[in-house]
């Protein structure tokens, strides 16, 4: 195994319009095949749709949506004496954000609207209102952790 220590985290630059690193990370999640310009256009147009439909600042709505999506607990598989247990563990802040952004984009892609901008805008609005597939994913993750609470003493 390598012994150089932990790999340094790469820091992203804040995006030009909202001056937010979180928005840059969301753009990076949306981006396919390195097409950053298209990903930016999708996100900014989605934010405009959010502004029109909610009448609020899209950053506030996005922050609320992300708070509603980010999980507090998750389960990790742990092998003990030939059996695999789903052990509930707390999610670290960095991973919470990553999972929230990942679920937001993935469940946006699965929606039925015509354009990705509409899908993303509607998923953000749904998540801000505590509905939608991404919020359901968080609820399911929490349910799994709750159901396996008996194995919490196997934490590492």
Curated annotation (Swiss-Prot):
**Record-level Gene Ontology MF annotations:** rRNA binding; structural constituent of ribosome; tRNA binding
Instruction: Name the UniProt key words of this record, in alphabetical order.
Output: Ribonucleoprotein, Ribosomal protein, RNA-binding, rRNA-binding, tRNA-binding
Briefly state the protein's biological role. One of the primary rRNA binding proteins, it binds directly to 16S rRNA where it nucleates assembly of the head domain of the 30S subunit. Is located at the subunit interface close to the decoding center, probably blocks exit of the E-site tRNA.
Q: Does the keyword Acetylation apply?
A: no
State the organism named in the record.
Halalkalibacterium halodurans (strain ATCC BAA-125 / DSM 18197 / FERM 7344 / JCM 9153 / C-125) (Bacillus halodurans)
Q: What InterPro entries does UniProt report for this protein, alphabetically?
A: Ribosomal_uS7, Ribosomal_uS7_bac/org-type, Ribosomal_uS7_CS, Ribosomal_uS7_dom, Ribosomal_uS7_dom_sf
Q: Name one GO biological process term.
A: translation
State the similarity comment.
Belongs to the universal ribosomal protein uS7 family.
Domain of life assignment: Bacteria
Q: Which PANTHER family match?
A: RIBOSOMAL PROTEIN S7
Quaternary organization: Part of the 30S ribosomal subunit. Contacts proteins S9 and S11.
Write down any Gene Ontology CC term: small ribosomal subunit
This chain belongs to which protein, by name?
A: Small ribosomal subunit protein uS7
């Amino acid at each position: 195994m390598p012994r150089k220590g932990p790999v340094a985290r790469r820091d992203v630059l804040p995006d030009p319009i909202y001056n937010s690193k979180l928005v840059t990370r969301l753009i990076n999640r949306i981006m396919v095949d390195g097409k950053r310009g298209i990903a930016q256009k999708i996100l900014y147009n989605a934010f405009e749709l959010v502004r029109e439909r909610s009448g609020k600042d899209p950053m506030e709505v996005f922050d609320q949506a992300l708070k509603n999506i980010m999980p507090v607990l998750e389960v990790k598989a742990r092998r003990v004496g030939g059996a695999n247990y789903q052990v509930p563990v707390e999610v670290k802040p960095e991973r919470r954000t990553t999972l929230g952004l990942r679920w937001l984009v993935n469940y946006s892609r699965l929606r039925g609207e015509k354009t990705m901008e509409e899908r993303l805008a509607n998923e953000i609005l749904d998540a801000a209102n505590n509905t939608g597939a991404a919020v359901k994913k968080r609820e399911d993750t929490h349910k799994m952790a709750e159901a396996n609470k008996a194995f919490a003493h196997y934490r590492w």
